[in-house]
Every structure is written in structure tokens, then in C-alpha cells.
Amino acid sequence: MTLIRTVLMAAALLGASAHAQGVVGKPFGFAAGTTGGGNAAPAAPSDIKELAQWLSDDTPRVILIDKEFDFTGSEGTCADCACCVPSSNTCGSSGQNAIETSFGWCGSSPNVTCTYDKAGTKGMDVGSDKSIVGVGSAGVIRGKGLRLTGGASNVIIQNIHITDINPEYIWGGDAISLDGTDKIWIDHVKISLVGRQMFVTGYESSGSVTISNSEFDGRTSWSASCDGHHYWTLLGLGKNEQITFARNYIHHTSGRSPKLGESSYWHSYNNYWSDNSGHAFDVESAGKSLIEGNVFSNVKTPLTKENLDGVFAVSADDESTCSGSLGRSCIPNVLTSSGELSSAGDGVFSGWLSDEGDLTLMPASQVASYVKAHAGVGKLGAGDYSSSAIPSSTPAPSSSALAKRHGGHDRHGLGHIPHLTEGGPGAWHTPGPAPSWSWRTIGVRSTALPTPSPSSSSCAIGKPTAGPPRFPIFGDLGIF
């Protein structure tokens, strides 16, 4: 009896310690200095209503996600509502149909009706000075994403799994969306089974952001590319935003991993891309990205061929060039069973807009094993972010020196998704028969195309915009 009582007491103390822990580690990269809820006493909300209230209020908080918060059905369903079959869906129920929007996204695509969960189409508003931290492996937010807008700043999102947001439907909802923010650290997060973007920034600058040690799991039964891979992965559109993207695991995707537009600047290092049946990087003319020390395994197209002036993807031949620009040697990328990754656009160096701080990079040969062991939920104790946690690392000097020289429940299988293997890429399908159709422009309607009338459905999402077609950033849907 005494032994049982001792074990129970130890378990209770362990639970209390976990609950009181809050944020683990410190942010690095562009989000260095982010404190979130700071010294606020960690507390766990009792239900989804209290969670939404705490996230959106003006009080600094450390919010513990100590269980699954399931928003499915909490705002009702839209039954028999207006949807369509886009030209990308050539595989029926294994593909993604699209929810019609009030700005007429479906256009002339064949109309169908569908039923979807309303909660997923708009994320929960998150205010400034918040730390949102999962406890152990228990922290799950199901059926609804997080939405940071309107000046929200100083936010930490750590060790949570966001999943099951209308994955059957394009425009079903986003997992994490930023627009007009600053100092955001996203760490040890897992995202899976979403209808639209796993992570997205809007047209207003998202400021200084670090995304680290996170898993973007694209395995799905509703694939826009009709091959079991998720297409809508990472989209950066904010003007002059600066994003450190480090030590993340991006797998089973087919595009937008990431897609960068406007003058979004990404420093992507020590990430592991695996089993991408389409493209990883797609950078628009104003976007900039320094890509170094990453591993691409079974990635069909690591980098699209257009607009390469602002992209520097480091190869073994580029180390001296990088040294002359940054004052250090860059780390070459490694590709296995993948397409080409070749771009030495020096325009990226003039786009380094503020101090990214001192960084620690590891050789690409160590990336795959490190990232698989550390990225995602339930792994906060697997290592910190200091140089001692990463073997054979190479410190990178702060970018201030550069600036001086040069003047960014299982409804769908959670819990029984098979373990990721190292098998080859999924079968490649050319999405859609129309020759003018392009995956890279889906969701971006040319001004030359006719603008259809807004849907009359009471469940249509989004808000119409004035002037030339420009997709809403954060209406009742998220972002394209």
C-alpha cells in the first residue's frame, strides 16, 4: 500500500512539474528575444470556450494544452452547401473538392454540394504576449487553427499538434496564419490533415518569425495532387517579413513547401524534406531565400526554375562565394533521389533586413537523423538549441556584419497513421488536363479571367473585395 501511495505521489509531482514548466528553450533566429507570456503562471484551460477566450484576450498568459481540445462540431456544420470540383481533382473521392467562396473562387468548375465543419474555416484569434505550450505529447487542437493578425506580437507556439481541419476540402481552413504580426516563435509543432495551408502569412508583414523543430506531415486521404500528398504546405506573402526556418521535417507534400511571394525573406537551413512528389521551393520575383545545409530526399523538384535572382541554394561549389558575402562558409545542401537544386542569385544578400543573431548550423550529413529525432510534438526534452546539442556544428555570425557590408480522435486516422518509411516518392500525377492550368497559380486568379458572381449559399466563405481580383487575407476562411 505504501509503495502504491509513493508511486501515485511521484506521478502527481511529475504531472505538476510538467504543468508548471511552460516554454522550453529560447527562440533564435529572427524571433530571438520573443518571450510570449513571460513569467505569467502557467495554466490549462478547462474547455474549448475557455481556451478561445484566453487566446484572444489582452492578458499575458502561458496557456498549457494538456489534452485534446476538439472544436469539431462546436460551431455547427454547413450541410449541402455550395462546393465545386476543381480541375485538379482527377481522382474523385481521393482528391480535394473546393468550398465555394463569396468571391467566386470556383468559377466555371462543376458545381456540387458538400458538408463541412464551420469551426475549421476560421482560426482562433490569438492576442499578444501569449505562450501556447503543449504538455508532453498530449497537446492537440483538433478542427480549428490559430490566427494572428492586427498587430499581434510576442507569441510562442510550442509542442502542439494542430490537425483535422476539413482536410477533404480546398478552403477548408488553415492551421497557423499570420498577418500584420511581429516576433512569433513556432517550435516543436506538428501540423497534419488540413484543408488548406499548414502555415501562411498574409500581405501585411508578419515581421520577425522563427519556425523550428516542427513537423509538416502531408499524408492524407484527400490529396489535391491525387497521390496521397498534401499540396498546400507553407505560403509566405508578407512584405519585408523575415523568417528563420530551421530543423523542420517536411514530408509527403506535393507543392508550396514553401511558396514565397512579395518580398518575403526566408533563411532555410538544416531542414529535412522527404517524399515530395511535386515542388518544394517556389519563389516569386520579389521573394528571397538563402537555402543551406538542408537535405532533400525523394523530392521531385526541390526548386522551380523561375525567378532565381533572389534565391541562393548552396552547393559545394558555392562555399567560397558565400564566404565572401557573409563572412563565413555556408553549408552545402545534400540531395538524394531528387531533382536539381541550383541557384546562386546574389540578390538574397541585399535582402537581409535585420539582425538574425548568432546561429548554429550542422553539416547536412547530420540533418536527417537529427531532425527526425527532434522535430514535432513530445520531443522538448530531446535537446535544446545550443551548440552543445548539435554535433560538429558551425557557428554563423550575426547578420549585422552582413548589413554593414551590403548596406527574412481520430476522425481521419490520427493515431493509426502508419509510421513514416524511407520508401520512394508516391506516384506522380499531372494535376488536371487543361493545358493552361498550373498548380503554382491555383488560388491566384489572373485579372484577365472573368470574375464569377459571389455564391448565394449562406455558407459561402470569404468576403468579396473591391477593385481587381485579390484574394482576401483573413475573412472567414484563412488565406489562399
UniProtKB/Swiss-Prot annotation:
EC number assigned by the record? 4.2.2.10
GO BP: cell wall organization; pectin catabolic process
Q: Could you tell me which SMART domains the record lists for this protein?
A: Amb_all
Please list the residues that make up the active site: 256
Q: Which GO terms describe its molecular function?
A: pectate lyase activity; pectin lyase activity
Q: What's the catalysed reaction? A: Eliminative cleavage of (1->4)-alpha-D-galacturonan methyl ester to give oligosaccharides with 4-deoxy-6-O-methyl-alpha-D-galact-4-enuronosyl groups at their non-reducing ends
Q: Where is the composition biased (Low complexity)?
A: 386-401
| Residues of the signal peptide | 1-25
Carbohydrate-modified residues are 111
Give one Pfam hit by family name.
Pectate_lyase_4
Region (Disordered) residue ranges read 386-436
Please give the positions of the paired cysteines in each disulfide bond: 83-106, 322-330
Might you report a single GO cellular component term?
extracellular region
Sorted alphabetically, the keyword list is: Carbohydrate metabolism, Cell wall biogenesis/degradation, Disulfide bond, Glycoprotein, Lyase, Polysaccharide degradation, Secreted, Signal
Location of the protein in the cell: Secreted
The EC category is lyase
Query: Principal place where this protein is found?
Result: secreted
- Its biological purpose: Pectinolytic enzymes consist of four classes of enzymes: pectin lyase, polygalacturonase, pectin methylesterase and rhamnogalacturonase. Among pectinolytic enzymes, pectin lyase is the most important in depolymerization of pectin, since it cleaves internal glycosidic bonds of highly methylated pectins.
- Family indicated by similarity: Belongs to the polysaccharide lyase 1 family.
Protein name as catalogued: Probable pectin lyase F-2
- Source organism (scientific name): Aspergillus terreus (strain NIH 2624 / FGSC A1156)
Taxonomy, top ranks, is: Eukaryota, Fungi, Dikarya, Ascomycota, Pezizomycotina
Gene name tied to this protein: pelF-2
